[in-house]
Amino acid sequence: MVDFILNAQVRSDLGKGASRRLRRNAGLVPAVVYGGDKEPQSVTLELREIAKLLENEAAFSHVIALNVGGAKETVLIKALQRHPAKGFVMHADFLRVVADHKLTAHVPLHFINEEVAVGVKQAGGEISHTISEVEVSCLPKDLPEFIEVDMAKVELGQIVHLSDLKAPKGVELVQLAHGNDLAVANIHASRVVKEEGSEEGAAE
C-alpha cells in the first residue's frame, strides 16, 4: 500500500549547525531513515514538499515511497520535530518498511454517528473524546488509514473502550494486546443541563 511519494537527497553535512543552515538557507529539512536491517541514512527533504504531504492526514498512517537520490525506500513517518511557534517541520524520522514484517504505527480515530448517538439525541448529552489515535500492529499491506468509532448506540454515562472498537482483519490494537483497555470516548450530561439544575436548586 503505497499512496504517497516523497523525494529526498543523501545528506553528508551532519550536525546541528549544518541542519540550521539547511533550514535557513535552502528551505530544506534534515531527516533520517532507519530500520529494516540497514544502517541509518541521513537525508534532506524540501520543506514545501513535506508540508504539502502532511496536509493529508492519511500520510501519517500510509506507507510512503521515499526516493533517495534515485534509490527507493518504503517508509512510514515515525516522528516529526516542529518549530514551537511557527509549526513547520524541522526534522523528520522515517522507519523502513519490510513487506513481510509486522510494523507498529499510530492510526487516527474517526468518530461517526455522533449527532444521532442515543445519549445525545435522546438524553441531550455531550460527547468527549479521550484519545484521537491508536497504536496498531500489522503487516504493511493491512495498515488502515483510520479506525472508525461508531457512537450511534452509546448512551448517556457510557464509556467506549478500545475493546469496543472493530479493528480491521489482521490489525491488532497494541495497548489492548498489553492489557490496557483504554477509554476512547464517553457521553456525559450537558454543562447547560447541569447549570440549569444548579440554578433551580438554588431558587428552591
Curated annotation (Swiss-Prot):
Q: Name one GO molecular function term.
A: 5S rRNA binding
Superkingdom is Bacteria
SUPFAM superfamilies reported in the protein's UniProt record: Ribosomal protein L25-like
Which InterPro entries does the UniProt entry name for this protein?
Rbsml_bL25/Gln-tRNA_synth_N, Ribosomal_bL25/Gln-tRNA_synth, Ribosomal_bL25_b-dom, Ribosomal_bL25_C, Ribosomal_bL25_long, Ribosomal_L25_dom, Ribosomal_uL5_bac-type
**Keyword set, alphabetical order:** Ribonucleoprotein, Ribosomal protein, RNA-binding, rRNA-binding
| Pfam families membership | Ribosomal_L25p, Ribosomal_TL5_C
Q: Name one GO cellular component term.
A: cytosolic large ribosomal subunit
Is the keyword Ribosomal protein in the record? yes
What processes in GO biological process is this protein linked to? translation
Similarity comment: family membership: Belongs to the bacterial ribosomal protein bL25 family. CTC subfamily.
Q: How does it assemble?
A: Part of the 50S ribosomal subunit; part of the 5S rRNA/L5/L18/L25 subcomplex. Contacts the 5S rRNA. Binds to the 5S rRNA independently of L5 and L18.
Function summary: This is one of the proteins that binds to the 5S RNA in the ribosome where it forms part of the central protuberance.
Name by which UniProt lists this protein: Large ribosomal subunit protein bL25
Species of provenance: Pseudomonas aeruginosa (strain ATCC 15692 / DSM 22644 / CIP 104116 / JCM 14847 / LMG 12228 / 1C / PRS 101 / PAO1)
Gene coding for it: rplY
